[in-house]
């Protein structure tokens, strides 16, 4: 499952080589390009039980769709390989997954599997990287793909900066064993 629009749409330059890496490792490869948000989720839902491994390439959002579908539809034992091709690939960086797509593909076919924590919110929404709230939490989702393709990580900074003029402060009281504070705060 891959998102052909993620990052700067550079996966297309490596896709045939990646397929060859899996084919040379005796994997029977099925390739599915996503067409819209949650498309990868639906594809994995429909393919429950058909694959021994699921590999995805895209950004953090594509990976989250795949992880959520695998867990939701009862295929938790199926390993997930990840070839990062998003704008920032924060999750991959945090786990030491190579940013080079070819190295990441070799890593999937020859690397050791590992477990990572998956969280769930309200018994229905899984997350593998970040669960957040505050003034800028929608920036990653609201940043237009064409901006991400053009500017990479800086697109998020631009989108976040647009929100600065609309920030609202909320009167709050924070109490802990070490301090009591009452003031106006901005969720950020």
Predicted regions and their residues:
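ATP/NTP phosphate-donor binding region
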Residues: 1-57, 64
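Short amphipathic alpha-helical segments
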Residues: 12-14, 67-70, 93-95
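Catalytic core of DAGKc-family lipid kinases
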Residues: 25, 32-34, 73-188
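Helix N-cap/beta->alpha junction signal
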Residues: 58-59, 132
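Gly/Ser-rich catalytic serine loop of serine hydrolases
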Residues: 59-60, 86
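Short Gly/Thr/Asp-enriched flexible loops that form oxyanion-binding sites at enzyme active sites
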Residues: 62-75
């Amino acid at each position: 499952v891959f998102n052909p629009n993620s990052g700067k749409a550079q996966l297309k330059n490596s896709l045939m080589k990646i397929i060859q890496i899996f084919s040379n490792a005796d994997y029977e490869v099925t390739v599915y390009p996503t067409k819209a948000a949650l498309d990868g989720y639906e594809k994995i839902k429909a393919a429950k039980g058909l694959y021994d491994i699921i590999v995805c390439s895209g950004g953090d959002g594509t990976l989250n769709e795949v992880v959520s579908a695998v867990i939701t539809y009862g295929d938790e034992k199926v390993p997930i390989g990840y070839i990062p091709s998003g704008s920032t690939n924060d999750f991959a960086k945090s786990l030491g997954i190579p940013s080079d797509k070819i190295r990441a593909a070799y890593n999937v076919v020859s690397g050791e599997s590992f477990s990572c924590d998956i969280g769930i919110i309200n018994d229905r929404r899984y997350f593998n990287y970040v669960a957040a709230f505050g003034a800028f939490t929608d920036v990653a989702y609201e940043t237009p793909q064409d901006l991400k393709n053009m500017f990479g990580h800086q697109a998020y900074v631009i989108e976040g900066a647009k929100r600065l003029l609309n920030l609202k402060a909320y009167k709050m009281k924070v109490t802990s064993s070490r301090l009591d504070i009452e003031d106006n705060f901005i969720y950020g």
